[in-house]
Amino acid sequence: MSHVKNTMDTPLNILHTWKGISLQEEQTTLPNGKTITHTTISHPGAAVILPIENNGNIIVINQYRPSLKKWLLELPAGTIEPNEPVELCAVRELAEETGYSAETMISLGQVTPLAGFCDEIQYL
C-alpha cells in the first residue's frame, strides 16, 4: 500500500546527474493531503557483503571517505551496474575490494539507510 503519490503529470525534474546517481525534485502529496516539493537522491542500489572466513573472522576494508575526511572500516560494497543481478554485483565487489571469493552466498535481506532523502536500496 502506497501512502505517497506523485501528483505531477510530467517526468521528475532532474537537477543534477553524476555516475548513475541523480538529484530529482517532484511534487508529492503526503498522507495528510499537503502537497510538497520533495528532493530525492536517486541511486541504482548497492550490494553489501558480509564476508565470513571459515574461522569466523569477518573481513572489513579500510576506506578513505572524502565526504567525511576520514578513514572508515566498512563491509565490502558497491553500486549495482545497469541490468546487473545483485548476486553478480556482490561477487564482483567482493573480489575487487578484498581479493576474496565466496564459497556460498546467502541473502540477508535489504536496508534503506537514507530513506528520508535517497531511494538507494542496499542488498545484504
Kindly give the residue locations of the regions a language model identified.
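Acidic, metal-coordinating catalytic segment for phosphate/diphosphate chemistry
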Residues: 12-48, 53-54
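Active-site segment of metal-dependent pyrophosphate-handling enzymes
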Residues: 22, 44, 52-54, 65, ...
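Conserved hydrophobic/aromatic beta-strand scaffold that supports enzyme active sites
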Residues: 23-27, 60, 124
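Glycine-rich, charged/polar anion/phosphate-binding loops
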Residues: 10, 34, 109-111
